[in-house]
């Protein structure tokens, strides 16, 4: 399993819908890149210049919205994960 360092989080992206509401099947090139995912692992938080550790605002299992082109994709086995900085997370979906 991947363990994020610092203020990074690892997410599993939500799959984009294969069809539109009207039933049209989308090709891979027509689909928009998903910017939602579920947090799989969270780093220990950000370290300030004075040495203070700031705890992350998100936790494992949170469903989030993140910036469209943020992060680095990493493949482990048959799954693809995205490693993001916590600052790239825009919102938690409740």
UniProtKB/Swiss-Prot annotation:
Q: Which UniProt keywords apply?
A: Chaperone, Cytoplasm, Stress response
Name the cystine pairs.
none
Superkingdom of the source species: Bacteria
Q: Which SMART domains match?
A: Cpn10
Any Gene Ontology biological process: chaperone cofactor-dependent protein refolding
The molecular function terms in GO held by this entry are: ATP binding; metal ion binding; protein folding chaperone; protein-folding chaperone binding; unfolded protein binding
Q: Which Pfam families match?
A: Cpn10 (PF00166)
Q: What are the GO cellular component annotations?
A: cytoplasm
Where is the protein localized? Cytoplasm
User: Where is it chiefly localized?
Assistant: cytoplasm
Q: What family classification does the UniProt entry report for this protein?
A: Belongs to the GroES chaperonin family.
Q: How does it assemble?
A: Heptamer of 7 subunits arranged in a ring. Interacts with the chaperonin GroEL.
User: PANTHER family given for it?
Assistant: 10 KDA HEAT SHOCK PROTEIN, CO-CHAPERONIN GROES
What's this chain's function? Answer: Together with the chaperonin GroEL, plays an essential role in assisting protein folding. The GroEL-GroES system forms a nano-cage that allows encapsulation of the non-native substrate proteins and provides a physical environment optimized to promote and accelerate protein folding. GroES binds to the apical surface of the GroEL ring, thereby capping the opening of the GroEL channel.
The protein in question is named: Co-chaperonin GroES
């Amino acid at each position: 399993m991947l363990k994020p360092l610092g203020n990074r989080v690892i997410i599993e992206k939500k799959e984009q819908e294969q069809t539109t509401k009207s039933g049209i099947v989308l090709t891979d090139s027509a689909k928009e890149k998903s910017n939602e995912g579920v947090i799989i692992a969270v780093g220990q938080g950000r370290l300030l210049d004075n040495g203070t550790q700031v705890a992350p605002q998100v936790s494992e299992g949170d469903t989030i919205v993140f910036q469209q082109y943020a992060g680095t994709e990493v493949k482990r086995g048959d799954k693809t994960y995205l490693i993001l900085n916590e600052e790239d997370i825009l919102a938690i979906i409740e």
